[in-house]
């Protein structure tokens, strides 16, 4: 067990199920499969109302195909463990939301992708860094002016920095629901990290999305067009954020028209 990480009952039960799946497979493969199945379940549930038409139809179908490919590689008895393990994650985060649950489990299980040199910064460290660097004043100005603001992590890992930033937002906006005024964007080159970050943002009830991509080659704090590489949280499609995107797009269109007229 990694030092400094507390093992709760939920975590212990999750680890028991995980170790059963590892009897005939490498632990990193099992972890990657778990994260993929959990993330696809959440992501496809989020876009289901939009999946009847393109471009979401292709995205939904592709992810369903990937889900079936992974789950069919396990025996029926093993398949039943995945929803049980996912439920344990949900219960643990309901009990204690202020944590990097998946990052801690990753270290607790001593899983590592040695080729990628992965190491997840402890949540306490991320929380300390965020408390020092997070510009509450600037964020407050943006929300007051625009009605909303965004927080972006270009190398999100399991999402610890974004989660700690959401804590700052919660403390800052005590009079109203920060989840309706701040959205969170993560990006990572490792698809398993994308899954981990996405799962945690979704289960924390945060609006936003996580992008699978190389930040050094293509930094994308704005919403890119290739939707197959984007994982939207459920609340991103809430009425509040749907209206915010609508007004934002209208504002952009208005500025373009104004700019075009001024040139004429």
Name the predicted role of every residue range:
Residues 83, 92-100, 165-171, 188, ...:
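Generic hydrophobic segment detector
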Residues 2-174:
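Class I S-adenosyl-L-methionine
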Residues 223-264:
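SAM/dcSAM-binding transferase cores
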Residues 49, 55, 219-224, 234:
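Proline-rich intrinsically disordered, low-complexity coils
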Residues 9, 33, 100, 153, ...:
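Acidic-enriched, low-complexity/disordered segments with a strong bias for Aspartate over Glutamate
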Residues 125-231:
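Conserved S-adenosyl-L-methionine
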């Amino acid at each position: 067990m990694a030092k400094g990480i507390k093992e709760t009952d939920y975590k212990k039960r999750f680890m028991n199920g995980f170790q059963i799946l590892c009897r005939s497979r490498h632990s990193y493969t099992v972890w990657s499969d778990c994260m993929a199945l959990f993330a696809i379940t959440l992501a496809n549930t989020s876009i289901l109302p939009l999946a009847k038409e393109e471009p979401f139809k292709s995205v939904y179908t592709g992810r369903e195909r990937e889900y079936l490919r992974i789950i069919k590689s396990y025996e029926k008895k093993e398949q039943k463990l995945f929803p049980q393990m996912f439920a344990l994650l949900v219960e643990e985060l309901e009990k204690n939301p202020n944590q990097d649950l998946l990052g801690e489990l990753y270290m607790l299980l001593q899983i590592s992708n040695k080729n990628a040199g992965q190491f997840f910064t402890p949540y306490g460290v991320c929380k300390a860094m965020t408390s020092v660097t997070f510009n509450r004043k600037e964020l407050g100005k943006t929300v007051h002016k625009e009605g909303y603001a965004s927080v972006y992590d270009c190398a999100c890992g399991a999402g610890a920095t974004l989660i700690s930033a959401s804590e700052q937002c919660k403390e800052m906006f005590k009079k109203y629901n920060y989840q309706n005024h701040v959205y969170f964007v993560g990006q990572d080159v490792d698809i398993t990290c994308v899954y981990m970050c996405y799962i945690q943002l979704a289960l924390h009830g945060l609006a936003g999305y996580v992008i699978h991509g190389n930040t050094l080659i293509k930094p994308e704090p704005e919403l890119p067009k290739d939707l197959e590489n984007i994982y939207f949280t459920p609340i991103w499609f809430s009425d509040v954020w749907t209206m915010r995107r609508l007004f934002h797009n209208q504002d952009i269109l208005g500025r373009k028209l104004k700019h075009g007229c001024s040139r004429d």
